[in-house]
Swiss-Prot record:
Pfam families documented for this protein: Zn_clus
Organism: Saccharomyces cerevisiae (strain ATCC 204508 / S288c)
Name the UniProt record assigns to this protein: Uncharacterized transcriptional regulatory protein YLL054C
A biological process from GO: positive regulation of transcription by RNA polymerase II
Localization annotation: Nucleus
Lineage: Eukaryota, Fungi, Dikarya, Ascomycota, Saccharomycotina
Length: 843
C-alpha cells in the first residue's frame, strides 16, 4: 500500500474545461461564460480571486442526497457520528488501490472465454468472497442433485421422482420451471433469429437482380411478406406515431422529416386504404434502407403494444413483432451494410440493436458479452463515419449538398444515440476506457451547445428536437462525468487513487443533483406543470407529446444509472478496505466503515427509486416509456438483489461468530447481546427488502419479461434459506460434504471451478477464511448499529412488521410439492443442463 506523492505546482485560475480546450476563459465564478453557454461542468483548480487551499475531504459520510429521499432520510445526518468522535483530527490518505483484477473478471463457461467488465454480475460475484461462496455452492449443488437423481433412476430403474425431506430441499425445487422456460425459449429463439448478429455475409443486393426471383434470398420475396403488414393505412400511421411518442424521445436517432420524405416515395396509397410498397425506379438502395427502418419501427410499436396491460391483442402483436424483426434482419443482410457504410445504414443497425436488446423474451437480466461486443462494434462504425466530429467541419457538404442541414442533424443524433446506449448499458457494467473518453470530449469541443447547433438549422429543426437536445446535452455530460469516474477507478495500467476517485464521485453527484433533481411526490413537493409539444409528423394529426413526463423519465433513468454506478464503486471500496482490515484493522477500519456506510446510502437511494417507480409517485412513467427503459430498471433490480444477498451472507457468518464467542464464554455479555440483536434486526430488514423486490418482480415483471421470471427463482431460494436460518449452514455444510471430494462428480467440479475460480482443491483454505472471526472483525457493533439506524429510518423499512414475512413467503408448498416440472427437467440431456445452469446460478 503506497501513498501518492503530490507535487506542488503553480495554481491556474482558468477553468479546467477552457484550459483543456485552450480557449480564453473569463474566470467567472462559479461558472464561466463558455461553460454556462454549453451547459458544461465548470471547475477550477483554485477559486478565482481566493487563496489556494488544498481541498479537504470531510470526515462525515457523503452529504445527504438532495431532493430524492423522504423526509425521514434526512435523519441519516445524525448517523455521521460513526466517524466524528474517534476521528476528529483524522485525515484521509490518498491510497493507491487495485479495485479490480483480471482473475476475478475471467469467465470460462461452456464454449465461452472472456474477461468481463468490472461491474458485470459475474465479476461482482467473483470479487466478493461471500458472494463467490454462495454462488459456487448453489451452482454445484444444482448439478450434483441432478446427477444423483440420474444415478438413482439408473440403479433402481424407477420412475423419475424426487423424494426428499424438507432438510434436503435444494435450489432445484425453485429453479425447475425457470430452467424449462429457459430451454423452451432457447429453442424458440434459435429458430426465430439467424445466429449471425452483425457479422453478415457479404451479399450485394444490387448484384442480385431484384426483378428476378432466382435466389433463395430475394428482395421481392421479402417485400411480399412485408406487404401484409401494410394493408391498413391508419394502423401503419398509428404505429409510426406511437414510435415517435414512446421510443424516439428516448432514442432520437433519425431525422423525422427526412424519413417521412423517403416514406412518401416508398409507400403508395391504394383504393383499399392500404399501402403498396413501390420499389421500382432509381435509387433502390435508399428505398431498401427506408423499408428496413420502417420495418424495425413497426416491430418496435407492435412489441410495445404486446406489453400493454390494457390491450386485448397482446399475443398477436408479439407474433407480428417477432416476424417483422426477422424480416428486418434479412433486409439488413441484403443491404451489405459494411460494404456500403453511411448514416442511414448505421441508423438501421442502431435501431435493430435496440429492438433486440429490449426484447422481453431475452433470458438475461443483464447485458451479455455479445451485446457489449456488438455495441462497441457499432461505436467503431460511428467513428469510421466521423460522427465524433462536429459536422460543420466537413465543409464540402455545405457547398455541394442542398439538404446538408438535415444530414448534419442526423449525424449528431447518431453519435448521441451510440453514447446513450453506452450510458445505459456499459456504465452500469463499469466499462470505460481512455480512448472512448477522448472521443466523447472531441464531440463537445465546440463553443456552442447542442440546442444552439440545432438552431443553426432552424428551418430544418422541429421544436421537439430542440427540446430533446437540451436534455440530451445534460445526459451526454453526465455520461462523460461517469466515464471519467470509472476511468479513475479502473485504469488500464497502474493503480487507482482514493482521493481522485472520491473527488470524481462528488463532481458526478453535484452535476446529477444540479441537472437531474428528482422530486418525489412523497416529499409533498408539487409536480411541475405539464408541457406538451406537437409531434413533428404529417401522420400525427397535431397529436402532442408530453415532454414533462419525458423529462421526469430521463431524470429517473439518469439517477438509476448514476446511483447503480456509485453504489458499485463504494461497494468495491468497502471490499478493498475489508481485505486491508484483515491485515491491519487499526489503520483501515475507518475507511471500511466509511465506504460500507456510503454504499448502503446509495443502495437505499436506488431501492427508493425502484420502489417509487413500481408502487409510488413515479408509476405514471411506466406506460409511455416502460418498454424503452425497462432493461435499465431490471438491471438495477438485479444488482440490488445481489447486494442484499451478499450482505445477508456476511450477517449470517457474523451471527455464527457471535454465537460461537458467547458459547465459548459460557455467557452472553452486554456487548455480545447488543451485537446479536442488531444482527438479527439487520437480517430481518434486508430479508424484507429482498422480499419487496421479489414481490415487485413477480407481480409487475415476471409475466412479461422472461429474464425476470428466470432470475427471481434463485432469490426465492435465498429467501427460503434466510427464513429457515440456514444461509451460512448451506454454504459450510456443502464444503464439508462427501460430494466435494467424490470423483464421480469430477466433471461438475471442473465446470464449477472454471466458472467461479474456486475448485475443490481450495475448499479447506476457503472455508477457513469464511469462518475466521478476524475477517469480519471490522463489521463490528459500531458500524452495524449505524447501518441499522440508517436502514430503519427509511419509509419502506418503517413499514416492516413481523407479520410481513408470512405474506411475502414464496408460494412454493414444500410439503405438497408437485414433481412434474422436476421430472420434465430430469428427462433432458445432461450436457444441455450443464449449459443452462451456469446462467441460472449467475443470479
Amino acid at each position: 500500500m503506497s501513498i501518492a506523492s503530490q507535487k506542488k505546482v503553480k495554481p491556474s485560475f482558468v477553468c479546467l474545461r477552457c484550459k483543456q480546450r485552450k480557449i480564453k476563459c473569463d474566470k467567472l465564478w462559479p461558472t464561466c461564460s463558455k461553460c454556462k453557454a454549453s451547459s458544461s461542468i465548470c471547475s477550477y483548480e483554485v477559486e478565482p480571486g481566493r487563496i489556494n487551499k488544498s481541498p479537504t475531504i470531510e470526515n462525515a459520510p457523503h452529504r445527504d442526497i438532495r431532493n430524492i429521499t423522504p423526509a425521514s432520510m434526512s435523519a441519516s445526518g445524525s448517523f455521521t457520528s460513526i466517524l466524528n468522535p474517534s476521528t476528529k483530527d483524522w485525515e484521509m490518505k490518498n491510497f493507491a488501490m487495485n479495485l479490480s483484477n483480471a482473475h476475478d473478471k475471467l469467465v470460462v463457461m461452456n464454449n465461452t472465454t472472456i474477461v468481463d467488465s468490472p461491474f458485470a454480475f459475474h465479476s461482482i460475484l467473483q470479487h466478493d468472497l461471500y458472494a463467490k461462496a454462495l454462488t459456487t455452492c448453489i451452482h454445484e449443488r444444482i448439478l450434483i442433485d441432478v446427477e444423483r437423481h440420474r444415478e438413482n433412476v439408473s440403479a433402481n430403474n424407477k420412475k423419475r421422482e424426487l423424494n426428499l425431506t424438507i432438510g434436503d430441499i435444494g435450489p432445484l425445487f425453485f429453479i425447475d420451471k425457470a430452467a424449462l422456460k429457459f430451454i423452451e425459449n432457447t429453442s424458440k429463439t434459435s429458430k426465430l433469429y439467424p445466429p449471425i448478429d452483425f457479422l453478415y455475409n457479404t451479399y450485394d443486393y444490387e448484384q442480385a437482380h431484384p426483378e428476378e426471383n432466382n435466389d433463395k434470398i430475394s428482395i421481392n420475396i421479402l417485400l411480399e411478406e412485408l406487404s401484409k403488414y401494410f394493408l391498413n393505412k391508419n394502423e401503419v400511421d398509428g404505429l409510426i406515431v406511437d414510435f415517435y411518442k414512446t421510443i424516439y424521445p428516448v432514442y432520437p436517432l433519425l431525422e423525422i422529416s427526412l424519413f417521412e420524405d423517403n416514406i412518401r416515395e416508398l409507400l403508395q396509397l391504394n383504393e383499399f386504404n392500404g399501402y403498396n410498397i413501390v420499389f421500382a425506379g432509381k435509387d433502390s438502395r435508399r428505398k431498401l434502407e427506408t423499408i428496413t427502418l420502417l420495418t424495425i419501427i413497426l416491430a418496435f410499436s407492435y412489441r410495445r403494444l404486446s406489453l400493454s396491460t390494457s390491450h386485448s391483442f397482446k399475443e398477436s402483436f408479439g407474433v407480428k413483432s417477432n416476424n417483422l424483426t426477422l424480416l428486418a434482419h434479412k433486409l439488413l443482410a441484403l443491404m451489405n451494410v459494411f460494404q456500403y457504410v453511411n448514416e442511414h445504414t448505421l441508423c438501421c443497425l442502431l435501431y435493430f440493436f435496440i429492438l433486440r436488446y429490449l426484447n422481453p423474451d431475452q433470458a438475461d437480466m443483464y447485458p451479455t458479452h455479445s451485446d457489449i461486443l456488438n455495441l462497441k462494434f457499432l461505436e467503431n462504425v460511428a467513428i469510421k463515419l466521423g460522427l465524433n466530429e462536429e459536422p460543420f467541419q466537413y465543409t464540402r457538404y455545405v457547398s455541394e449538398s442542398d439538404d446538408y442541414p438535415r444530414l448534419f442533424n442526423l449525424r449528431r443524433k447518431l453519435w448521441l444515440g451510440v453514447q446513450f446506449l453506452k450510458f445505459g448499458i456499459l456504465i452500469p457494467e463499469g466499462d470505460s476506457d481512455i480512448l472512448s473518453l477522448e472521443y466523447l470530449r472531441s464531440f463537445m469541443k465546440t463553443d456552442e451547445s447542442l440546442p444552439e447547433l440545432f438552431e443553426r438549422n432552424y428551418a430544418s429543426t422541429n421544436n421537439l428536437d430542440l427540446s430533446l437536445m437540451a436534455t440530451a446535452e445534460n445526459i451526454y455530460h453526465l455520461h462523460l462525468s461517469l466515464q471519467v469516474l470509472l476511468t479513475s477507478c479502473f485504469p488500464i495500467n497502474g493503480p487507482s487513487y482514493l482521493k481522485e476517485v472520491l473527488d470524481n464521485i462528488d463532481k458526478t453527484k453535484d452535476f446529477l443533483n444540479q441537472k437531474f433533481p428528482l422530486i418525489l411526490s412523497s416529499l409533498g413537493e408539487p409536480r411541475m406543470k405539464s408541457l406538451h409539444i406537437n409531434v413533428p409528423s404529417s401522420l400525427a394529426n397535431e397529436e402532442s407529446f408530453d415532454f414533462s413526463t419525458f423529462e421526469e423519465n430521463e431524470t429517473f433513468i439518469a439517477n438509476v444509472i448514476s446511483y447503480t454506478c456509485t453504489m458499485n464503486i463504494y461497494d468495491s471500496l468497502s471490499l478493498h478496505f475489508e481485505n486491508q482490515c484483515f491485515k491491519n484493522a487499526l489503520e483501515y477500519k475507518t475507511y471500511y466503515h466509511r465506504f460500507t456506510f456510503t454504499a448502503i446510502q446509495d443502495y437505499l437511494t436506488l431501492l427508493k427509486l425502484i420502489s417509487e417507480y413500481f408502487n409510488g409517485s413515479l408509476l405514471h412513467l411506466r406506460e409511455p416509456f416502460g418498454f424503452a427503459t425497462q432493461k435499465v430498471v431490471r438491471f438495477s433490480i438485479h444488482r440490488l438483489l445481489i447486494f442484499q444477498a451478499t450482505l445477508l451472507v456476511r450477517l449470517f457468518y457474523k451471527k455464527d461468530t457471535c454465537d460461537r464467542s458467547s458459547a465459548a464464554m459460557g455467557m452472553l455479555n452486554d456487548r455480545n447481546g447488543r451485537l446479536s440483536r442488531v444482527i438479527e434486526k439487520m437480517i430481518k430488514l434486508m430479508s424484507y427488502h429482498m422480499k419487496l423486490l421479489v414481490e415487485i418482480v413477480i407481480s409487475k415483471l415476471e409475466k412479461s419479461y422472461l429474464g425476470s421470471f428466470i432470475s427471481v427463482s434463485i432469490f426465492r431460494y435465498i429467501i427460503y434459506l434466510v427464513d429457515t436460518d440456514a444461509l451460512s449452514a448451506f454454504i459450510s455444510d456443502y464444503w464439508k460434504s462427501d460430494a466435494v471430494m467424490d470423483e464421480r462428480y469430477s466433471r461438475i467440479h471442473r465446470i464449477v471451478g472454471l466458472k467461479w475460480g474456486m475448485g475443490r482443491d481450495k475448499s479447506f483454505s476457503f472455508t477457513s477464511k469464511l469462518n475466521n472471526p478476524q475477517f469480519l472483525g471490522s463489521l463490528d457493533l459500531e458500524i452495524l448499529e449505524e447501518l441499522e439506524k440508517l436502514i430503519s429510518a427509511q419509509e419502506f423499512s418503517r413499514n416492516f412488521t413481523e407479520d410481513v414475512d408470512e405474506s411475502l413467503q414464496s408460494e412454493i408448498d414444500l410439503m405438497n410439492y408437485d414433481n412434474e416440472a422436476l421430472n420434465q427437467l430430469m428427462a433432458i440431456d445432461l450436457d444441455k443442463l450443464l449449459g443452462i445452469f451456469p446462467n441460472l446460478s449467475n443470479f
